[in-house]
A protein has these predicted regions:
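Hydrophobic core
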Residues: 12, 16-20
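Cleavable N-terminal signal peptides
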Residues: 17, 26-28
Length: 173
């Protein structure tokens, strides 16, 4: 048993070292090209489109809000046009803005306004069930505004087809 543990530990150590060496080689190769990409990431914004007051270091301050985010994102994209902005989902449910989730798709449309390239669904995008999510997606699409691309997994494609939501979608197996 002891010998098996030692052999396993040795093999894992070698595998980790090889993995680190491969990573170092990739980073050096990327650095040689002179190309640089920045990635901005948000998640769990929960309908907080507006700023809100909170206590920071014992003082009340206005924090958050999509206007502040837009400023930071634009500044970063001005510094480096090769900036990718990703959102990890749960962009809805958390303020009264959620009450127009299905009819206005405010959160998803605002992510588009911010310049979000790609988002996904968190659990709160399903708070109004699949039909609410479908209504929100159709509303966002019908607005004609720029909305982020969506990446998802574990999707029932037959239900998506039935709801008419597969146009422009690609299933990767």
């Amino acid at each position: 048993m002891q010998r098996t543990k030692k052999i396993t530990a040795f093999v894992l150590a070698i595998a980790l070292c090889v993995g680190m060496l491969q990573t170092l080689g990739v980073n050096a190769k990327a650095a040689d090209t002179g190309k640089h990409m920045d990635v901005l990431f948000t998640h769990d914004t929960h309908s907080h489109l507006n700023s809100f007051p909170t206590i920071v270091d014992g003082k009340q301050e206005e924090v958050g809000g999509f206007a502040r985010l837009k400023t930071l994102i634009d500044e970063q994209k001005e510094k480096n046009p090769d900036t990718l902005y990703l959102d990890g989902g749960d962009f809805s449910m958390g303020t009264l803005i959620q009450t127009v989730y299905e009819t206005e798709a405010a959160e998803l449309r605002m992510l588009g306004y911010l310049g979000c390239d790609v988002t996904t669904w968190g659990n709160h995008e399903f708070d109004y069930r699949s039909s609410g999510l479908a209504n929100m997606l159709n509303t966002a699409k019908a607005s004609g505004e720029n909305v982020p691309s969506l990446v998802v997994c574990n999707v029932n494609w037959s239900a998506m087809e039935k709801a008419g939501l597969t146009e422009g979608q690609q299933q990767i197996k």
